[in-house]
């Protein structure tokens, strides 16, 4: 009986050893982009999700989350910032909730609505008026942000630039120019 158990164990052991658990490598052909695709990537006026804009030539289109309409790596004198463009339905959570969430992301305490409204800088673009907010964490010079909120009929457009304090100071003018250039794409 013991010989049968040992024999069954050895058979089981040999059958369970399979080469399919080894690492496999595959070679895939490289995807070549046409000239037209390359030009669209470098376009100064992208037409994504119903909006167009003009960006500074130094801004580099980048991968962002699936929620973003667009993402850019934004170089400045001592580093790189991250700019995101997002559109959310309705009020997208509301002014107070969004501003206080952004403040929390850089280590700042929440504010009351009256304080938030007092800090808003007005702006104007072809899609309508918007508000810009500047957040700088004085205890952490690497934590700063510019954010713009564009309320529209059925949605809200958000543009957010995160960088260091120096980056925000360097990029503020370009950020405001970018926000003012936002237009609805009439080809949609």
What do the PLM-derived regions correspond to, one by one?
Residues 9:
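Flanking scaffold residues of small Cys/His-coordinated metal-binding clusters
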Residues 2-6, 15-81, 88-94, 100-105, ...:
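N-terminal targeting sequences that direct proteins away from the cytosol to non-cytosolic compartments
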């Amino acid at each position: 009986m013991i010989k049968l158990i040992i024999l069954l164990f050895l058979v089981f052991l040999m059958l369970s050893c399979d080469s399919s658990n080894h690492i496999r490598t595959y070679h895939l052909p490289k995807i070549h982009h046409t000239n037209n695709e390359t030009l669209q990537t470098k376009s100064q006026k992208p037409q994504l999700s119903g909006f167009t804009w003009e960006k500074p030539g130094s801004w580099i289109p980048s991968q962002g989350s699936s929620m973003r309409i667009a993402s850019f790596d934004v170089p400045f004198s001592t580093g790189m910032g991250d700019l995101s463009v997002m559109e959310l339905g309705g009020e997208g959570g509301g002014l107070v909730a969004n501003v206080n969430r952004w403040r929390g992301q850089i280590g700042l305490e929440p504010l009351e609505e009256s304080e938030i409204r007092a800090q808003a800088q007005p702006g104007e673009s072809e899609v309508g008026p918007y508000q810009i907010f500047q957040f700088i964490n004085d205890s952490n010079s690497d934590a700063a942000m510019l954010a713009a909120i564009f309320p529209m009929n059925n949605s809200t457009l958000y543009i957010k630039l995160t960088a260091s304090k120096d980056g925000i100071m360097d990029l503020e003018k370009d950020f405001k120019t970018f926000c003012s250039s936002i237009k609805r794409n009439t080809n949609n």
